[in-house]
Amino acid sequence: MEVILLERIEKLGQMGDVVNVKPGFARNFLLPQKKALRASKANLAFFEKQRVQLEALNLKRRDEAQAVADKMTGLSVLMVRQAGESGMLYGSVSGKDVADAVKAAGFTIERRMVNLDQPIKTLGSYGVRVSLHPEVSVVVTINVARSAEEAERAAAAAAAAAEVVEAEEAPAEEDVAAEETSEAAEA
């Protein structure tokens, strides 16, 4: 079934594209959600009339989402969960749990905005992508720990490891710069 996209849809196309999709996907998702119109001459003409308004609305929504994304950049959320000795969680952290934690941090998002490929089943720190708009997404750090103290210790250890890596890279960069200057002087 051919449809006209009314907004950008990941892995499908941009607004205004006429794409061929499976009939069930069109009937059950795209058409009821008002993300697409059936591709007919009348609907193509209607879309062309409405195109400027739709693009302006999309631009406004994208700008609002970008403003929220700028505020959410670098957001780290702690989730306290029970876990066994090996670090395996009793249960898992799902997209709904992540959405609730981000809401508790003061941002309004829905569960469907959280892109979690698989549920989180072990302790640790994870980067989870939150799609605020089809064109705007931000990565939120989810720190899953047994307690707040354990999370602080893990964060301190990660920061120390990052400092060690930076300290090791800095002399290497200085050596490369020195070699480049000596090569330039020889030439």
Swiss-Prot record:
SUPFAM superfamilies: L9 N-domain-like, Ribosomal protein L9 C-domain
Record flagged with keyword RNA-binding: yes
GO molecular function, one term: rRNA binding
Annotated signal sequence range: none
Region (Disordered): 168-187
Entry keywords, A to Z: Ribonucleoprotein, Ribosomal protein, RNA-binding, rRNA-binding
InterPro entries recorded: Ribosomal_bL9, Ribosomal_bL9/RNase_H1_N, Ribosomal_bL9_bac/chp, Ribosomal_bL9_C, Ribosomal_bL9_C_sf, Ribosomal_bL9_N, Ribosomal_bL9_N_sf
Any one cellular-component term (Gene Ontology): ribonucleoprotein complex
UniProt GO BP: translation
Superkingdom of origin organism: Bacteria
NCBIfam families membership: L9
Family designation: Belongs to the bacterial ribosomal protein bL9 family.
Functional note: Binds to the 23S rRNA.
Protein's UniProt name: Large ribosomal subunit protein bL9
Gene that this polypeptide is encoded by: rplI
